[in-house]
């Protein structure tokens, strides 16, 4: 028997417990409808901050307009928070009351 086997023959070797990684919680970034922000500005925001093409941005804008809110995307908490701040800051800087929020997906 080899020396290494002899050293551990009478001892149990503990295996490192493998921890299962959980995916991070996800959050939806949502635009909320108001009566003052122009539809064109909403489309601009969706293209600028969410990388949507014109057709997709128009579709989401119409969802905001007719349903009261529209989902811009689903992200991890940090990214969602950043996008909410970016959109709200951009809207205020352009004197629009557009409100962007986040909610658990």
Swiss-Prot record:
Q: Which residues cross the membrane?
A: none
- Superkingdom is Bacteria
What GO biological process, any one, is recorded here? Answer: protein catabolic process
SS bond partners: none
**UniProt family annotation:** Belongs to the ClpS family.
Function, as annotated: Involved in the modulation of the specificity of the ClpAP-mediated ATP-dependent protein degradation.
How does this protein assemble?
A: Binds to the N-terminal domain of the chaperone ClpA.
Q: Which PANTHER family match?
A: ATP-DEPENDENT CLP PROTEASE ADAPTER PROTEIN CLPS, ATP-DEPENDENT CLP PROTEASE ADAPTER PROTEIN CLPS1, CHLOROPLASTIC
Q: What protein name is recorded for this chain? A: ATP-dependent Clp protease adapter protein ClpS
